[in-house]
Swiss-Prot record:
Heterodimer of a large membrane-associated beta subunit and a small pyruvoyl-containing alpha subunit. It is found in: Cell membrane. HAMAP family: PS_decarb_PSD_B_type2 (MF_00663). This is Phosphatidylserine decarboxylase proenzyme. It is a peripheral membrane protein. Keywords: Cell membrane, Decarboxylase, Lipid biosynthesis, Lipid metabolism, Lyase, Membrane, Phospholipid biosynthesis, Phospholipid metabolism, Pyruvate, Zymogen. The lineage of its organism: Bacteria, Bacillati, Bacillota, Clostridia, Eubacteriales. Binds 1 pyruvoyl group covalently per subunit.
Amino acid sequence: MIKYYNRKTKNYEIEKIAGEKYLNWTYNSPVGMTILEKFIKKKLFSKIYGLYCNSKISSYKIKKFATDFNINMSHSEKSFNDFKSFNDFFSRKLIKSSRPIADNKNFLISPCDGKIIVYNNINMNNIIQVKGITYKLNDLIQNDSISKTYEKGTCIIARLCPTDYHRFHFLDNGICESTIKIKGNYYSVNPIALNKINNLFCQNKREWSIFNSDNFGKILYVEIGATCVGSIIQTYMPNKKVLKGMEKGYFKFGGSTIVLFLEHNKVIIDEDILTESKLGIETKVLMGERIGTKLN
């Protein structure tokens, strides 16, 4: 059971997890863990499932998935009959009015839909994955000099579950450098897995880039793949000016995670998010929503 905070209703809610029984069996049983280590975490498994999700035959499951998880299709640019495959539906674009951007230049926005948790004043050698499990930033991006930039900074973890909108965006005006790709495994990024696998983010396939933002300094974007995420697609043009809210890229099928690192004294995170984060509880947010304010 995963409890999160809905800041709009100011209530706690329980996340409806796609494939919950499968996840619990895989990560909490000896047989499941054996199959996970031998096959499921490997690229081949995600590649095979990705081929299925790209096929026309996979489109039959779209309506049921949307109904089961209460996905608001009025926000989608396409209707059910327009999707060519499940991946086409999964990486769907939304109409702009469904995700208004908090456009005040001093507002830090969420780059995606998902559940976020925030850690301030981080120790780059002891970053929290979940309570009791930590990792090193250098292990995550494999670049020691850049890692040192974010000592005592802010870490924002945005977890996208399979039912979320899976495109991610720029949280300010600025220029993003080229993406660095790191090969890895394909563990789930669901809290069920995060509580079982040490250094999970540092083991999974991931990509990172430096975003030179106009108002929040150098922001480190890290996109982390997961089980069945066949691809992380970067759609932006490196070293070209982008505007707040513009698309950076998208994930193909599967749950995924974006981890953001901001330098020390660049942002004050909204109090409700900080309060829940201190309790170890994620907060539900939508892309474009304010999550913090520039520290002057």
